């Protein structure tokens, strides 16, 4: 049986207190973390070199020693934030797989996870993921970095789904890689409705996603 606190565990996993991954150089790490913090309050195109230097206390020479320009730094910060999203997704699903003992419990857990990731509270996170992906499409430099993080997420989901399939918690008739991509697609796809003048009723959308989970992931 799923623990009573499983829903709150999901919320904690998707909080914003996850530590930033460290790079090999402390100054570079500090600059990236500073830029990542600024992205909490400002748009990509609003952040300047001066804002980063004022906040970090690091010299301009050090910044340009590690980064070609401000965009190089901000791309690194966006990748770090994306990596944090990857880590929280993996943690939440690992927690579910550890807790669920039956297919029905796995279904309930996926439904709860879906409600969190597609709720109003994650709207900004969805927008940021879309912005990061969009930036990577036009920046070969960033694309290489994002490919690694995206592959890490997909690979982790594939393995988690395979584990669930081996325990008969999840439909074993569908390719685990295809299921992993679908799981990501329905969450990120909500960004389309986030930008709508007349958004869909979220309960209706979640009911539809739950039906997909029931009929595709965990059929009775």
List each language-model region with its residue ranges.
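Hydrophobic/aromatic-rich alpha-helical bundle segments in the mid-to-C-terminal region
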Residues: 143-147, 151, 165-213, 220
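Residues in soluble alpha-helical coiled-coils and helical-bundle/repeat scaffolds
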Residues: 68-72, 76, 97-101, 137-141, ...
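Helix-turn-helix
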Residues: 30, 34, 38-80
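N-terminal intrinsically disordered/low-complexity leader segments
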Residues: 1-26, 220
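Amphipathic alpha-helical segments used for helix-helix packing
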Residues: 119-144
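Solvent-exposed, amphipathic alpha-helical segments
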Residues: 30, 34-41, 88-95, 128, ...
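Hydrophobic/aromatic residues within well-ordered alpha-helical segments
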Residues: 70, 77, 81-85, 89, ...
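Hydrophobic alpha-helical connector segments
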Residues: 76, 89-126, 176-183, 206
């Amino acid at each position: 049986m799923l623990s009573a606190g499983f829903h709150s565990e999901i919320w904690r996993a998707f909080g914003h207190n996850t530590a930033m991954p460290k790079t090999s150089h402390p100054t570079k790490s500090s600059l990236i973390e500073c830029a990542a913090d600024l992205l909490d309050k400002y748009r990509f195109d609003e952040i300047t070199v001066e804002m980063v230097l004022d906040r970090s206390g690091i010299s301009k020479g050090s910044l340009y020693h590690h980064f070609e320009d401000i965009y190089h730094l901000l791309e690194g910060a966006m990748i770090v934030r994306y990596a944090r999203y990857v880590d929280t997704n993996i943690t939440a699903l690992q927690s579910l797989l550890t807790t669920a003992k039956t297919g029905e419990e796995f279904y309930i857990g996926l439904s709860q996870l879906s409600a969190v990731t597609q709720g109003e509270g994650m709207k900004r996170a969805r927008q940021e993921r879309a912005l990061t992906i969009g930036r990577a499409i036009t920046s070969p430099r960033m694309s290489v970095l994002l490919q690694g993080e995206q592959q890490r997420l997909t690979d982790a989901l594939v393995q988690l789904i395979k584990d669930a399939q081996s325990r008969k918690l999840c439909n074993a008739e569908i390719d685990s890689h295809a299921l992993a991509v679908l799981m990501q697609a329905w969450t990120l796809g909500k960004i389309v409705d986030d930008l709508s003048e007349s958004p869909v009723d979220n309960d209706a959308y979640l009911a539809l996603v739950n039906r997909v989970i029931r009929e595709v992931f965990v059929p009775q």
